[in-house]
């Protein structure tokens, strides 16, 4: 009987710890998701300013960027090279990148993700592209860094018909 009572008490304690931990995890998760979204906001501001250094600092050393219609950029050096072509030119042309109003996200332990929509406007405010993104992050030394990042346009894919690029 003592063994059963001891096992029941142990089980009750385990349930209490798990349920209590779940509640703490939900609160912690909301805080972590907010931190992930804050990193997304830093990325957007840096892109719009053509600030490649700030953009690249948001990626882990061995992160992989998966741009649409192009090979993967593996590691910070390749990510820097890609963004060095994109961000300063976009800033110079007055393009404005923004994220949709309701991004999704989640966090569990040292991993988290964010997903949502984006809009790219020209300097007159005309929408030239809409799309969606998905980023996976890892928390390292208290900071969320992207480990995988991808996006794609809502527009139709480029034609694969031979000579389509030269047709009007």
Question: How should each PLM-predicted stretch be described?
Answer:
Residues 2-12:
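Bacterial N-terminal signal peptides that target proteins for export
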Residues 4, 21-61, 158-168:
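Short, low-complexity N-terminal intrinsically disordered segments enriched in polar/charged residues
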Residues 10-21:
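Bacterial N-terminal signal peptides
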Residues 30-37, 52-110, 117, 127:
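A solvent-exposed, acidic/Ser-Thr-rich amphipathic alpha-helical stretch
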Residues 109-113, 132-134:
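Structural motif
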Residues 115-121:
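Generic short beta-strand segments
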Residues 130-155:
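Short beta-strand edge/turn micro-motifs at domain boundaries
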